[in-house]
């Protein structure tokens, strides 16, 4: 892997001054920053390659199509899908989950059941609530304990022949816990259920192998993987994607259209109606190239060192409350905490005055906050460009906030 200084040099935003302080960006769980290698791919596309893709006979259209489909292959190889046609470009993880939920909402009936976990992001709860409302199916919830660890014993009891879909996150966006999705998938398949995994928080830190996991659907967002916003991908097993009805109608997703009926395009285009985010897809491919240039194993190892260092430092602060699994081998580089007697929003405001960007609130995971009976947490989430020195400054900032607000 490059040196930390070389990596940081790839990210121009890290040279920003915020409130007269050098930017310390610890909000990577919300979105990661973008390296010049990805920015340059975006500039190159709009400068020299901009055209609508597919069906165009002119050179520019064919070049743009080739770049877009090459990016799809990069996503396929990164996640080890069998075919590039099993990779759908979407607007992001939320869009991907809604696509699957809409499809199964049309296939399910009263008496069927969907299982999610108590740890989910709202994007993996609300689409299934809507699907259940439309179909008459029921929503069941895997409980968690005080560490945010899912109760697999109760999960097994929830599973039955009525279970049609299990939809769970790979990594908690609020706590950083890595869930045992291998076991969750295997148990669901025993009863004939399909499994969707929300991989938004896992993909930047781990390298999920969809074939090894035997997962049915896996959803990710590019903007959490050093790529642009507004684009992501959904992996789906070919045989399951063929069973699902189209999510949206329009151009590109059809074979033939007449007023009596229409027939639909082959995968993946059946689910890609309209002009896609062409530049976003190409830039997503560039972001994957960037991550591989650093090494996925190396990224994970370095971020884990940051996590361990930060947790050890935080534990020295009197009055701090830490959330999440205490076994840091089962965590990504996400830390949720509170200071006793201090609202998380106030802590975040003080840190911002010091140039430190963190996320405060419920992190689109209100059921977790309800479990802990708190309004929210302060969340610091690290990426490969963060440093131990930044963590030291962060710790001093927390101490300053505590002195000012307690």
Predicted regions and their residues:
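Pyridoxal 5′-phosphate
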Residues: 1-406
């Amino acid at each position: 892997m490059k040196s930390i200084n070389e990596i940081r040099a790839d990210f121009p935003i890290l040279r920003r001054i915020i409130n007269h302080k050098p930017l310390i960006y610890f909000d990577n769980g919300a979105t990661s920053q973008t390296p010049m290698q990805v920015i340059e791919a975006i500039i190159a596309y709009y400068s020299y390659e901009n055209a609508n893709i597919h069906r165009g006979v002119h050179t520019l259209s064919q070049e743009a199509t080739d770049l877009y489909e090459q990016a799809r292959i990069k996503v396929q190889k990164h996640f080890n899908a069998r075919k590039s046609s099993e990779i759908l470009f979407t607007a992001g993880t939320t869009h991907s989950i809604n696509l699957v939920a809409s499809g199964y909402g049309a296939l399910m009936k009263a008496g069927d059941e969907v299982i999610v976990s108590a740890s989910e992001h709202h994007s993996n709860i609300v689409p299934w609530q809507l699907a259940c409302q439309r179909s008459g199916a029921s929503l069941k919830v895997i409980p968690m304990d005080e560490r945010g660890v899912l109760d697999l014993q109760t999960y097994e009891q929830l599973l039955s022949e009525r279970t049609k879909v299990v939809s769970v996150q790979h990594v908690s966006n609020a706590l950083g816990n890595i869930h045992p999705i291998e076991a969750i998938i295997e148990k669901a398949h025993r009863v004939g259920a399909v499994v969707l995994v929300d991989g938004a928080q896992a993909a930047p830190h781990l390298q999920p192998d969809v074939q090894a996991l035997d997962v049915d659907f896996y959803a990710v967002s590019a903007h959490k993987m050093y790529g642009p916003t507004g684009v992501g991908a959904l992996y789906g097993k070919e045989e399951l994607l063929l069973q699902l009805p189209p999510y949206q109608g329009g151009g590109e997703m059809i074979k033939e259209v007449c007023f009596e009926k229409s027939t639909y395009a082959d995968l993946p285009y059946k689910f890609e109606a309209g002009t896609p985010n062409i530049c976003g897809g190409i830039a997503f491919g560039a972001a994957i190239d960037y991550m591989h240039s650093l090494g996925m194993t190396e990224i994970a190892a370095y971020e884990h060192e940051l996590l361990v260092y930060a947790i050890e430092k935080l534990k020295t602060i009197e009055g701090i409350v830490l959330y999440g699994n205490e076994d840091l081998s089962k965590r990504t580089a996400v830390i949720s905490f509170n200071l006793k007697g201090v609202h998380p929003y106030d802590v975040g405001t003080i840190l911002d005055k010091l140039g430190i960007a963190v996320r405060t609130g419920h992190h689109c995971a209100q059921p977790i906050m309800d479990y802990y009976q708190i309004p929210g947490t302060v969340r610091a989430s690290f990426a490969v460009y963060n440093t131990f020195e930044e963590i030291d400054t962060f710790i001093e900032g927390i101490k300053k906030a505590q002195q000012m607000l307690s």
